[in-house]
Structures are given as structure tokens and as C-alpha cells.
Amino acid sequence: MASEGTSWGAEDIGAQGDQVQHSEEQVDNYAHDSLASGDADAADNGTEDDGGEYDPESVTIGTPAMVPEPASSGTQRQTSKPKMSGGFIVEASDDEDEDEDEDEDEDEDEQPASAVPQTDAVSTQNHPGPSTTSDEHVPAAPTHAPVPPAVPSNVTPVLPGFGPVDLLEFRVKEDPRGDMDAWQELIASHRDFSPLEKARSTYNRFVEIFPQAADKWVEWIELELKYNNFVEVEQLFGRCLMQVPNVKLWTVYLDYIRRRNDLNNDPSGQARRTVTQSYEFVIDNIGVDRDSGNIWQQYVQFVKNGPGQIDGTDWQDRQKMDQLRGIYRRAVAVPMSTVNNLWKEYDQFEMGLNKMTGRKFIQERSPVYMSAKSANIALDNITRHLDRTNLPRLPPAPGFNGDQEFRDQVEMWKKWIAWEKEDPLVLKSDEPKAYNQRVLHVYKQALMALRFWPEIWVDAAEWCFQNDIRENDKEMGTELLVEGIKANRESVLLALKHADHIEVNYPDKEVDKAEFAQAVRKPYDDVLETLYEMGDKVKEREKLEISTLKQAAAQDPVQTSIEENDDDEDNTPKRSPTEERILAIQKGYAAETQLLSRTISYVWIALARAMRRIQGKGSQAEGGLRKVFTDARQKGRLTSDVYVAVALLESVVYKDPVGAKIFERGARLFPNDEMFMIEYLKYLHSKDDTTNARVVFETCINRLVSNPDTLAKAKLLYAYFHKYESQYGELSQISKLEDRMAELFPEDPKLKSFVDRFSTEKFDPIATPIIISKTAQMRPKQIVPVVQHQHQQSISLRNSPMPVRQEQNPRPQYVRATASPKRPLAVDDEELNPPKRLARGASPLKGAAGRRLDQQRRNQASALHRDITFLLNILPSSQSYDAQRFNSAALVSILRDTEIPDFATLKAAGGGQPRFGNPTHTRQPSGEFVNRPLSPYGRMSAAAGGYRNSPLRPETGNAYQSNPYPPPEASGQQPTWPQAPGGYGAPAPGQFGGYRY
């Protein structure tokens, strides 16, 4: 092992820097496998017998059979060839230099011939010819294939022959599931301007990809009905009717049945019986839909127009009444928009026959109707913003346009499904079949809109498994999984769920394990095949886009400046705009390829674990874990995760030393993958092989540090090894390691390495503070945030001189004068000398309201909202206000301490007169004060002044004398009499700035 680690520096350079074993790693596979019998075997002397019969180094990886070898004639490029990018034609170039450029790019990519054919024929796969494409490669009606089939390289489109329809054909072939707009335009064009056979072919291709698109089925059926093609119409109904629970489609079916069965010329009654059976068939399948109200009403009207009288006594009449009663009783139990009208009709129907029995029937069905009515209101609220479309679209990628709107629609569908599962109509216990029908129906409605959302397929299948839902003796859950996989061939979730269901419920597991393993493996193989096709498609798109960009750059060259720029300190060569765009394209496709490779790798890991459970370790030929690992290496496009998972399975489950060889193999394939190296180090440490672990660490670190591009990857390796040395190593080794880390990563805090010695994922004894004094260290934070600018501004306002108080205007002062005869309090009277409260009667809040208020006072005050605290903080100090301030506490005290007698006492005292009486003043006030109440200080007699006799002063009763002085505000003039001495007769000054309360 130690010597093996030292040999990594001499390994192939092509393997370095690659962390994905796809087409590039296949070159390494061939190189390393060719060395397996030479250098690798020589390095493994003494350990060859440990592997037993299985040696991963001896696996022969042949050329994948799925990719054909390119024909020699296909390597010759055409001098003028149109290019396609995103469904649009890019003008071809006659320059021959692009051939050499693309050949150089292909050599740089190091693509083996077995993985990607070194020919430009792949670039024509995205842009097939108009009609010269052979049926062998491009089928006329692809079945739910997300990736268009390959096009022969000898097919060269001719530019003059292209039209709008041809461009639409290219768009739908390039993106069959995503370009819904192109599909609709293409269908409309063929329907309106092409022969019927062409329109049929287009419709057929569309419904194979979107089999639940009810609107397109209706268009196709109406097109056939336009030409009276009844045989084709019935065939279409047989294909779509049971698969598409759409009200519009089933309504078209009813119209067709009524059209084909003439009720006016029906002496035998066979036509009416056929229509009746059709209505029952439709009601049984689509009658639970909340939009099926019109079908119910049409059925009722159809029965009413039939033979017989509703109030008759003949057997036919009674049969008609029983039929109508049955329809009504079923219809009023369905939550739909017409349930209220149907209930009114049912009420009139029953009461018109017999009021006694009618009331009985109405009372029996009334609870069901009320439940349906309330459920309809609830459904209106749930589905108010729901888009019940049957033309599904691919879900937008997270963070892109339409992502949030699509997820909102998904949540609405989930809310509707959850509402149906809660059983608001109370059907689960009494009518379980009706309950299952309703839930399954809403699942089917959701699948019509969310066809490309795998989660909804799995959710529906899981519910069917739990409730044992079957249709036509078929397990509905399995059918949903199969249909979901057809709609989403690349979905790993659906493939894993289907394989898991097969593994759990396979009938004869012990009889034939090979057949059992093949049944479980089929979903894995299908999704892997789709993912590999998508990976090839990504590579082809990348080459096509780069070649198109080079053609455009060659046709429009940009002259670069040759002047020296003094601002450029370094002498690094500048890239042209074309090179920058090519680099950006390569980075984008590299990220997409990496994502596909990781997905493929984890599917292989899941398959390896499943086969190990079924067939055990197995062998390279018979099956099991090792067979899966061999197949995965042959297919390629693997990440290091596959090697880690298989090596750990061999080591942990079977205690086989082959796991170490797999790790060694992965270390040569992924020398710059820091995560793989960490797993390798963990494995060696688990085996107490510290010597080889240190060799592996040093070898990988030296390789990563030598390249500035991979220097950042070394930090994770250093962190892991430093943690291991901190726990089990010597202090000298720890110090040396920390010095090396500080030298390589000077931007990291030096204290961090020291702290990492003693911390774990659960606890950090150094960073966690120790509380010494709760008083000093655990003070609660202030609720009101301090804003520095406003705080300084308020301080400056408080320190600045206050403005001079202005004199009060006499007229507003009179308006603000209080009508209370009680003496106003001074400014600080309440604060210094609180008023004595007189004993009062029982408070009206002694009951529950009082207890609630008392509880609120006892509870701790809640923190104010952030915006409120900010507003309170920026308000100026109260000292900056110049206007008179309102003392709310004094007003509340007056209202609280004032005792108001009852009306009898008030009337006996002479009060109760209206306040708006004729004044006794000799002159009328100005027009502004004509309709205001009289001033309590005006000249009026004791008998005429109701307010003067008010018992607000019970100590004197009605013995008050009139005020001998009119207020100066009443006359609008300055007083001519001398000011009365201070005392009871003089009016008191305003409580706050002259205001009276």
C-alpha cells in the first residue's frame, strides 16, 4: 500500500483534474486496465490472493454497445450545412477552417470514439431535414420520448425549402415536452391548411406525449365529426374517454350519443334507452366533478321530457317519478355550483307530488344537501386561484421565471387533495366507495395539470397502495407509477419508487432469484438509459453551440487592439470576446454534465444495493453487487461516489479486502477529488492503517498544492487530517500541520486551528461562554433600538433654548373653555398630591371582564413592534412642544368622581331643561356662535338656566347666584371692569396654558 501511494505521481496526466468518469474517464479505464496485468499487478504482489476470485483491476471494459461506431463516410463534412440553435437556423459558412477548429476542440476534449463519435453528424441531430429523413431513425410518432431520435449524417436540409411549418416541426422535435406553443401553432396550421391525414398525424404525435390533453382530444374529435367520420370518432373515444376525466370531453361524448340516437324517430324506445345508459355511464365516471352541474341538469331535463306524466298514476308515470327522485337525491349530494338550483327543483318536485311524503323525503336528504352546500363554498375558496388546465407544462427550474407561480399551483392542488382526504362530506364510514372515487378523481385532475411533476404521481400511487384501490382487477397504484414513468422517463423518484414496490411485493422471491432481480432492475435500467441519452444530448448541444459561435465569429471578425495598455500590470494574454463566450458555454454545459453524472452515479449506487439484497455479492457474470459495478464501469460517466459506495459494501458487509483495491482504483481515477480522498482516509483509519493513510494524504496534498487551481481543495483534506491528528496524534505532528496550514492559507485566523483541536460537532468548549455574573453578563437588551442620528438630534433640541410662548387668542380660548363647574387642577397637582378617591359603588367590571383586565395588568407587557419603537425613538422630547398639553388623567379623574343622579332627582331639582334655550343677553353673539350651547357664565336667570341648576355641586343645590361678570370672550371686547380679587368668585386660571376641562 505504501509503495502504491508513491506511484500516483507517475500516473496518466489525463486522469488528473477529472472527477467524473464519463467519456474522459473511459480513456483512463482503458489505460489503467491495460496496466492491470503489468504495473498494477507488480505493485500488488502479495495482496493478489486477498481478493479471491474478484479483482476490480482485472475487469475488462469493452466498447459500450449502446453507441454505434461512426461510419467512415460520415466523417466527411459538407461545405455548406445549416446549423440549428434553439430551434432557429443559423446561416452556414463556407469556410473550411472551422473543420480544423472543431477537430482541435475534439482532440482537446479527449473523447473516445466509443463514447462520442468524432464526426459532425451529431450536430445535425438537433436539426433534421424537412422530409428526407428516413423512418428508420426518426419515427413518425415517437412514444413519450423526451429526447428526439438521431438523424443520419447524410441528411442535409435545404434552406430554400424551409417554411414556418418546417421550423415548427424542428422546434417540437428538439423540445417535444417543453415547447407547448410550437405544438399548438403546428396543430392549428395542419388543421386549417393541411390535408386531414397530416392533421391526424400531428394530433396523434401530440397525444402520445400529452395523453391527458382533453382540449386537443376535443379538437380532434370535432375535426372528425366535421367530416362525419363516425368510425374514427368512436375509436378516439375508446382511446381517451376512460383516461381523461374531463367534463368537456365527456359532454362531447354525450352530444355524440344523442346525435347518433334520434329520439324523435324512436318507436321501439331503443334510442332513449341508449341515451339513458350513456347518461348513467357519464354520471358514474364524471358525476363527482364540481363542474358537472350542467350534465346533471341535462340528465334531469332528459328524463322530464321522456314519456309519462310526473303526477300520473300509470306504471310508466311512477317509473318516471322514481327515476327523477333518484337523480335528484344523487345530485344534491355533490358539491357543485348548481347544487342550490337542483335542491330547489327537488323540493318543488317532492312537494308537488305529495306534501306529506315530500316533507319526509326532503328531511331525509336535507343534511346531505347542507353538507354539499358548505363543501361547495369551501371548494370555491380552495380553487379560487387554481388553474385547472389539461395542457401541462414542464416545471420551471428553481429561481427562474414562473417558478414561484408553478409551486403555488402545486400547493393549491395539494390543499384540494388534503381537503378531500379529510372527508368533509362524511363518506368514508358510510360510503367508502364514493369516498375513494372522490379522492381518486381529484388526484386524476391534478395529474392532468401536473403531469411533469413526479411527486404528485408518487403521492397518488402511495394513497392507492394504502387504500387498496383497484380498477378492472388492476392495482391502481402500480398503474399510476407506470404512467408516471412514461410521462417522466428521467425521474429518479418514480424509478426508485417503482423498483422498491416490485422488490417488496414480488410474489415468488425465493423461486427464481434471477427473474426476481431482473424485474427489480428494469426500472433502474430504464431511467439510466434515459439519463445517458440526456448526457449525449448535452454534449451534442455543446458542440453545436460552440461551432455555431465560431462560424459567426469567422463571418464577422473583430479587430483587436494591438496598443499596449499601461494599466495591465501582468502580461497574461487577453481572451477575445468569442473565447470568453465559448468558455462561458463550456462552463455551463460542464455544470449540467456534472449534475447528470452525479445523478447517474447515485442511481447505480441504489441499483448495487438492491442487487446485493437480492443476489448478494455475486460475480461479474452471474449478477449481484459485482455485476452491477462492472456494468457501471462499462457505461461510464461515473463519479467517485460509486467507488466509495461499492468499496464500503465490500468491506463492511462482506469483510472483503477487495474494498481496498476499489479505493486504490478510485484514487487513480479521481486523484483531485478531495471528497473521495477524505473517504479513502476514513477507510484507512478505520482499518488502523495510519502509515498508508499518511502516504495517501501527503501524495494528494502535494498534487493539489502544486496547482493553484486546486489549492482550495486541499483545505478540506487539511481540516480532516488535522482533526484526526488532534484526537489521536502527537503534539509535534499537530504543530507541524498547523504551520503548513498557516503558510498555505494565511487568510484563515491562526486561533481557528487551535480551537479546532478541542471542538466537536456537538460542543465547542472554547467558544462557549461561561457565565460568571448573571447581573453583569445577562442583562436583557433594550426593547427600543437607539438610532444615533435621531438621538443626537433630540439631545440638541433639549439643550437649545425653548421658544417664547405666544399669547392665546381670546376667541379660540373661549371655544376651548370647559363647561365643567369644578375647579381645575394645577399642572403638577396630580403628580405631587394625588387626589383622594371617594368610595364608589361596585364597578361594572367585577365579573369576567374585570378578571380579564386584571389578568392583562398582571401579565408582562409585550415588546412593541420594531416600527413602533423606531417611531417613538425619533420623536422629539416632550419639552420641545410649545402648545398646551392635554391631561388625560385629570379628565378621567373628573369623569370618574362625578356622581350623576337619576332622572327623578334631577327633575325635582329643577334640571333637565334643554341647554339650547333663549339667552338673556342684551346683544346677540356673532354668527359664528349662534348655534353653540350657552356659556355657563352668561347672564341668565336661575329658572331659565338649566345648566346653572345642574346638581353637579350637590353641596349647594340650586342656591347658586348668577355670575355678575360676563366673560370677555362672550362679547368679543376687552373687559372694562377691574379684575376681581383672587378667591372663589374669580375665575381660576387655565389648567394647562389657559385651557379649561
Swiss-Prot record:
One GO CC annotation: cytoplasm
Name recorded for this polypeptide: mRNA 3'-end-processing protein RNA14
Keyword Nucleus part of the UniProt annotation: yes
Region (Disordered): 1-152, 549-579, 792-854, 907-997
Compositional bias segments (type: Polar residues): 72-82, 116-133
GO terms, biological process: mRNA 3'-end processing
Subcellular location: Nucleus; Cytoplasm
Free-text function comment from the UniProt entry: Component of the cleavage factor IA (CFIA) complex, which is involved in the endonucleolytic cleavage during polyadenylation-dependent pre-mRNA 3'-end formation.
Gene3D superfamilies to which the protein is assigned, alphabetical: 1.25.40.1040
Gene name linked to the record: RNA14
One annotated GO molecular function: mRNA binding
Major localization class: nucleus
Coiled coil segments of this chain: none
Organism, scientific name: Gibberella zeae (strain ATCC MYA-4620 / CBS 123657 / FGSC 9075 / NRRL 31084 / PH-1) (Wheat head blight fungus)
Compositional bias annotation for Low complexity: 32-44
